[in-house]
């Protein structure tokens, strides 16, 4: 008999059997780590603390993180989400999202006398600092990322005269530089590690003296979640990724699962998005979630799968995350 542990999910239990074993009964492989990263946790708590301290409304420029459930929950608590600072009443409180903003946004907020609380992920801030540093040294900066993504817009805004966006492998051939001795690549933090390295390889073939960033720009959580998916995907006929469609790191997890051997992979916002037809003939389902997804949504998916007979849950653990980021100074408790 397979040892199990109660998960608090009706009809489901955790099995200690290794991934390599293939039980005949239906099962779920549950990726660990998954869900909230340190930057998302900090950003969501920033809005919650701002509401507690100042009361509603607290304005938030763009979605604080790319997850519908999180945004809807905060909106019900009194957060008001806007696209630009011009929509915020003069003198009001505004929170900048985890994805970061360009310097022009800070200027606009100052001109409107807004009380800014910056929830930019510290790992995104690191990339901003790198962009400014290399721009000061007059480098051409090749920013690998997705056009229009808030994080890319913010990073490019730090050095608009020096940054060129490289959006995918096919964009490499369009890149031009002024001095092949002064070229560096930076990246959006939520990309596929494998695709990014493929792009870097092609860039380096064109520009042999291409410099790497001082440290890895793709965040630890993005990498960890992709590694966990790669570990379980070969065992899965189906992988379900919990996350919103505008979440870059969640979309990448679907791609990684398919690339690592899963027969099918789907992105769902919550359990009701699961199509029962996906489960036809499926014995093993992999489950993971993007870095902006609260665990309650994963629990809902596991409950739905348990109702469909997937009552054994086997964790697939590839890393243990302990990183915590301090809240913005304006919201820290006095010591």
UniProtKB/Swiss-Prot annotation:
Knockout or disruption consequences: The lytB2 gene cannot be deleted, unless an additional copy is provided elsewhere, demonstrating that this is the essential homolog. lytB1 cannot complement for loss of function of lytB2, but the sole LytB homolog of M.smegmatis is able to compensate for loss of LytB2 in M.tuberculosis.
GO cellular component: cytosol
Biochemical pathway: Isoprenoid biosynthesis; dimethylallyl diphosphate biosynthesis; dimethylallyl diphosphate from (2E)-4-hydroxy-3-methylbutenyl diphosphate: step 1/1; Isoprenoid biosynthesis; isopentenyl diphosphate biosynthesis via DXP pathway; isopentenyl diphosphate from 1-deoxy-D-xylulose 5-phosphate: step 6/6
Catalytic activity line of the entry: isopentenyl diphosphate + 2 oxidized [2Fe-2S]-[ferredoxin] + H2O = (2E)-4-hydroxy-3-methylbut-2-enyl diphosphate + 2 reduced [2Fe-2S]-[ferredoxin] + 2 H(+); dimethylallyl diphosphate + 2 oxidized [2Fe-2S]-[ferredoxin] + H2O = (2E)-4-hydroxy-3-methylbut-2-enyl diphosphate + 2 reduced [2Fe-2S]-[ferredoxin] + 2 H(+)
GO molecular function: 4 iron, 4 sulfur cluster binding; 4-hydroxy-3-methylbut-2-enyl diphosphate reductase activity; metal ion binding
Positions of the catalytic residues: 151 (proton donor)
Protein EC: 1.17.7.4
Manner of cofactor binding, per the entry note: Binds 1 [4Fe-4S] cluster per subunit.
Cofactor: [4Fe-4S] cluster
Single GO biological process annotation from the record: terpenoid biosynthetic process
Binding site for isopentenyl diphosphate: 66, 99, 149, 247-249, 292
Keyword vocabulary terms for this entry: 4Fe-4S, Iron, Iron-sulfur, Isoprene biosynthesis, Metal-binding, Oxidoreductase
HAMAP family xref list: IspH
Family: Belongs to the IspH family.
Cited function: Catalyzes the conversion of 1-hydroxy-2-methyl-2-(E)-butenyl 4-diphosphate (HMBPP) into a mixture of isopentenyl diphosphate (IPP) and dimethylallyl diphosphate (DMAPP). Acts in the terminal step of the DOXP/MEP pathway for isoprenoid precursor biosynthesis. Has a higher activity compared with LytB2. Is essential for M.tuberculosis growth in vitro.
Name of this protein: 4-hydroxy-3-methylbut-2-enyl diphosphate reductase 2
Organism the protein comes from: Mycobacterium tuberculosis (strain ATCC 25618 / H37Rv)
Origin organism lineage: Bacteria, Bacillati, Actinomycetota, Actinomycetes, Mycobacteriales
